Amino acid sequence: MEEHIQDRREIAFLHSGEFLHGDSDSKDHQPNESPVERHHESSIKEVDFFAAKSQPFDLGHVRTTTIVGSSGFNDGLGLVNSCHGTSSNDGDDKTKTQISRLKLELERLHEENHKLKHLLDEVSESYNDLQRRVLLARQTQVEGLHHKQHEDVPQAGSSQALENRRPKDMNHETPATTLKRRSPDDVDGRDMHRGSPKTPRIDQNKSTNHEEQQNPHDQLPYRKARVSVRARSDATTVNDGCQWRKYGQKMAKGNPCPRAYYRCTMAVGCPVRKQVQRCAEDTTILTTTYEGNHNHPLPPSATAMAATTSAAAAMLLSGSSSSNLHQTLSSPSATSSSSFYHNFPYTSTIATLSASAPFPTITLDLTNPPRPLQPPPQFLSQYGPAAFLPNANQIRSMNNNNQQLLIPNLFGPQAPPREMVDSVRAAIAMDPNFTAALAAAISNIIGGGNNDNNNNTDINDNKVDAKSGGSSNGDSPQLPQSCTTFSTN
């Protein structure tokens, strides 16, 4: 029996932990060990992996930590290194801290960018406001200068003043024209500005329109007025002292002679143009039509023609009559500055206004014979008719020499032109009764004014009649027609 017991071997059940720890630990976890096992070390050991009461396996150097996230449940396994004693969550915390710092920095940059954007908008608005104010100030300054120039320019008293005034009027714009040509952006910008004087500008336009209604002749532009000059000339053009360049010609209806077009080349951008064409009825007559005003200084040889055309255009646009125009053109200022009028000692221009032309046109005809020289009315009223007639001594000198007639200086110390003297000589040579008629007129005037010197007057008259072979009558004689008109043609 004992032998049978000794040969019997028992099977011992071990837990998984006891199997891994070996025999040294198995003694502590086997409290109900049989006495047979104490004597017999060779026993079969089995591992029970399905034990009901299994204890947690402890490796000794590894422990489990639970990580609870923000969601409330365990979302990770945190392993702690036994050597360093640090957890993997520390790196995640550092990353999250850096991310939150970056978010704060980004928010700060966004806020700063928003402030800078707002500041830029304010600066842009201030700049636009300042620019509108500068434009308004410039416009006001230009309008003030233009108004001042209109006040400083004298009235059309002389042809030279008119000549200097026309280019300014053509180059400068009126305030109404400037406001019409203003761009829509400028108008909108000035209306948006709360400080812009919108109402005064409208009142200024109304006042300008009122002035234009009061002066309808001022609305006509000087550039559109044309002055035609008819003169006899065999040359291609009339020498008016300016330099011209021909830029074209064309045939006109009803005239076999072509019409040539010229522009002034004395200065760059000079707006003056002229058209030259011969008359169809008389080819010796050359018609020159001027348009525009010179914007540059003129030589002395060109001043007379420019002054004449400017005066004619001014009279045309101002609505003056042809008689006033004739007086203006007959003034010494328009005829004494150039040799162009030396062939015309007395201006006998016939001014003709043309209403059928597309532009206001005035024609100055220089082909007619000159009119007789008539002294101004103030000289006649002050000195009387006897002051302009020669005395008896001058008549004797004329009869003795039979060469020249001593004509007193009526209009100043200047001597009469040579052409006039030649014309007088020719008239005296053609009419032998001139001296007799002139002596009779003088005797009648002197005899009626001085009763005390009747005898001397009769003696002088008899001497004159004896020398001239004429007779004096009681009636006042009339001067022959050939003596009252001087022709230089």
UniProtKB/Swiss-Prot annotation:
Task: Name the residue ranges with Polar residues bias.
Answer: 469-489
Keywords attached to this entry: DNA-binding, Nucleus, Transcription, Transcription regulation
Major place of residence:
nucleus
A Pfam family this chain is assigned to: WRKY
Q: State the residue spans of region: Disordered.
A: 15-43, 143-222, 449-489
**Protein's cellular compartments:** Nucleus
- This protein's name: Probable WRKY transcription factor 47
Native organism is Arabidopsis thaliana
Instruction: Show the taxonomic lineage.
Output: Eukaryota, Viridiplantae, Streptophyta, Embryophyta, Tracheophyta
